A protein has these predicted regions:
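Conserved loop-alpha-helix segment in the C-terminal half of the alpha/beta-hydrolase fold
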Residues: 73-104
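Active-site nucleophile elbow and catalytic-triad environment of alpha/beta-hydrolase enzymes
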Residues: 35-55, 84-91
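Flexible "cap/lid" loop of the alpha/beta hydrolase fold
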Residues: 4-40
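Catalytic active-site module of serine/aspartate enzymes centered on a nucleophile-bearing elbow/loop
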Residues: 97-132
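Short aromatic-enriched loop/helix-cap "lid" or pocket-rim segments at secondary-structure transitions
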Residues: 12-17, 75-79, 114
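Short, solvent-exposed loop/turn segments at secondary-structure junctions
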Residues: 7-9, 69-72, 107-110
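Short beta-strand/loop motif that positions the catalytic acidic residue
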Residues: 59, 65-67
Length: 132
């Protein structure tokens, strides 16, 4: 599995991040936006799985966590937000015994746009390492 600057289940605790949002309107609508898209329930199931299975909920599943090297390019990311995001990315990289985190330098959140070759290479490397 290749995760591209992915959100983590901790982001369900959106109230922890409400001071990060640039406007009051975003703060009030953001949770409803995700609920309307059906994203929140899927994140809740991931959280439950992680809490149930302990340190490595995905066992030996090979996982590559691609982390943007510069979220500040988004314009609204503060140093505190960047610190939290990097912490969440590190936590994602610990969900499997066979996971690795790759810090994609000179890339903002949209790695798939700015450095798509990193994603392709990561997928290819995972496939190459599989037996048979």
């Amino acid at each position: 599995m290749v995760l591209v600057d992915s959100s983590t289940y901790q982001l369900l605790q959106w109230h922890r991040f409400q001071n990060y949002y640039p406007s009051k309107d975003v703060k009030s609508t953001e949770p409803f936006y995700y609920e309307a898209l059906g994203i929140t329930p899927s994140l809740k199931s991931v959280k439950e799985k992680i809490l149930r299975k302990g340190d490595h909920p995905f066992g030996n599943l090979p996982i590559v966590v691609l982390t943007a090297g510069n979220e500040k390019d988004l314009g609204y990311f503060t140093a505190s937000m960047e610190h939290d995001w990097q912490s969440f990315q590190r936590q994602l990289s610990k969900t499997s015994n066979k996971s690795v985190q790759v810090n994609v330098k000179n890339s903002s959140h949209f790695i798939q746009i700015y450095q798509p070759e990193i994603i392709v290479d990561s997928i290819y490397d995972l496939i190459k390492k599989q037996p048979g």
